């Protein structure tokens, strides 16, 4: 079969590459064409556009590149029609992909599958109308989305498991824990580690890292190790490190989590990865408009939590210090509990097991691929 995939960022490239590998295992004749990235290209097929030509985040960058964005959409639509695939598979990236879904629905007879659904349960719930109209089958990686889509909106979806479980499980099997080698390879001291995961975007790092360092520096018996984000130069971090004693390491986030005793983590997939490595954590997310965000969370946003760990468990597993509740003092208090209060730490680790059970076992790409082929062959 012919599969046309569209992703718009690095995480989509990763997840789509695993899905493509699983599709090839189920369908040896699989032919891929895609808007994607290097990982997808390594699996095989034809890359029409690299996601780096699509990825504009924030109001001003989008406004400045509107002509390019519309040109990319036009190119994508024309290419889909010309190639005439058996299915179009959209991966996350809803601003672009929902526009493509609408076009494919109205202008072709090609089925539209959505892998990693838009997070409309948190924001822009009105998009459900277009999803129900334009998307033939939706494949979710978050268990709580089943109730949201199926019960609340009468739109049946397929939960296939979470690919982060696959990624962490595969890493742990391939890389057994080796503290001595990790410390030696990174010129670290023989002291327990507090891991700092300060986000993947420059604004997140600017807003969060300085206070995270101040809070963690209050524990001199621990060494601080910062996970450098892909695409962020070491020089960018150094302007916010100041006099803090911290080691920055790149391309080793999983290895760092494997050897950490505690962690300060901004929101996003990193909170889930930290939990799957069974590292006690505090979720920290500061924004300069903290009071506005707090108001939005209470009155407009649809969710009780911001971390995937708490959202999946549907209860507070880890403490979230967000917007105007994030302060150096609050972070220090929570870190102290993680380090000194064994009962508190054990309770969090037990809750991690509950959360992991809700996610289910590894195998998300394989489950998705098998279900997709089953539906396409009907």
Label each residue range with its predicted role.
Residues 1-378:
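Nucleotide-activated sugar donor-binding and catalytic core shared by glycosyltransferases
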């Amino acid at each position: 079969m012919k599969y046309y995939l569209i992703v718009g960022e690095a995480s989509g490239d990763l997840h789509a590459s695993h899905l493509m590998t699983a599709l090839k295992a189920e369908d040896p004749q699989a032919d891929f064409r895609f808007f994607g990235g290097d990982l997808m290209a390594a699996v095989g097929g034809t890359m029409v556009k690299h996601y780096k030509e699509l990825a504009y985040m924030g109001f001003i960058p989008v406004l400045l590149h509107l002509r390019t964005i519309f040109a990319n959409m036009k190119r994508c639509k024309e290419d889909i029609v010309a190639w005439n695939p058996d299915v179009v598979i959209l991966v996350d990236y809803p601003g672009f992909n929902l526009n493509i879904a609408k076009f494919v629905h109205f202008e072709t007879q090609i089925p539209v599958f959505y892998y990693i659904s838009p997070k409309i349960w948190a924001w822009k719930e009105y998009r459900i109308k277009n999803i129900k109209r334009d998307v033939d089958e939706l494949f979710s990686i978050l268990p709580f989305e089943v109730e949201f889509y199926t019960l609340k909106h009468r739109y049946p979806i397929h939960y296939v498991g979470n690919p982060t479980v696959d990624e962490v499980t595969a890493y742990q099997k391939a890389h057994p824990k080796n503290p001595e080698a990790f410390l030696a390879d990174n010129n670290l001291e023989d002291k327990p580690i507090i891991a700092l995961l300060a986000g993947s975007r420059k604004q997140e790092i600017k807003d969060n890292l300085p206070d995270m360092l101040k809070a963690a520096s209050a524990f001199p018996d621990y060494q601080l190790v910062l996970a450098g984000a892909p695409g962020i130069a070491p020089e960018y971090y150094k302007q916010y490190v100041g006099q803090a004693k911290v080691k920055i390491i790149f391309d080793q986030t999983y290895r760092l989590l494997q050897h950490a005793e505690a962690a300060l983590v901004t929101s996003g997939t990193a909170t889930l990865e930290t939990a799957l490595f069974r590292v006690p954590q505090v979720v920290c997310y500061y924004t300069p408009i903290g009071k506005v965000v707090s108001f939005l969370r209470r009155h407009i946003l649809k969710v009780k939590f911001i971390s995937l760990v708490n959202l999946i468990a549907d209860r507070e597993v880890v403490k979230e210090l967000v917007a105007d509740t994030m302060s150096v003092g609050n972070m220090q208090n929570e870190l102290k509990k993680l380090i000194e209060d064994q009962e508190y730490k054990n309770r969090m680790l037990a809750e991690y097991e509950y959360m992991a059970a809700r996610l289910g076992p590894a195998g998300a790409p394989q489950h998705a691929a098998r279900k997709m082929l089953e539906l396409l062959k009907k």
